[in-house]
Curated annotation (Swiss-Prot):
Signal peptide as annotated in the record: 1-23
AXPX repeat residue intervals: 23-26, 27-30, 31-34, 35-38, 39-42, 43-46, 47-50
Modified residues (Leucine amide): L62
Swiss-Prot/TrEMBL GO biological process terms: defense response to bacterium; defense response to fungus; innate immune response; killing of cells of another organism
Domain of life: Eukaryota
Keywords, alphabetical: Amidation, Antibiotic, Antimicrobial, Fungicide, G-protein coupled receptor impairing toxin, Immunity, Innate immunity, Repeat, Secreted, Signal, Toxin
Designated name of the protein: Vespid chemotactic peptide VT1
Organism: Vespa tropica
Compartment annotation: Secreted
Family of the protein in this entry: Belongs to the MCD family. Crabrolin subfamily.
Residues making up the propeptide: 24-49
GO MF terms, alphabetically ordered: toxin activity
Tissue-by-tissue expression: Expressed by the venom gland.
Main location: secreted
Length: 65
């Protein structure tokens, strides 16, 4: 069981590093006038595909269905 926790933290850390590596810098509203005003100012559209993967990894490591 203790190894599952180690792998969990390793996967989370590696995904965080991937996001920091490939994340685009937050654009200012002046640079993108067509941006939605409702969008979060620091939202990263490249991170959206990672969210379902993280959920599946966490549920698999924690033994949940």
């Amino acid at each position: 069981m203790k190894y599952n926790i180690v792998f969990l933290f390793a996967i989370i850390a590696s995904l965080a590093c991937l996001q920091l590596t490939f994340a685009a810098p937050a654009a200012s509203p002046l640079a993108n006038p067509g941006a939605s005003p409702d969008a979060a100012p620091n939202a990263d559209p490249l991170a959206d595909p990672f969210l379902p993967i993280i959920g599946k990894l966490l549920s698999g490591l924690l033994g949940k269905k």
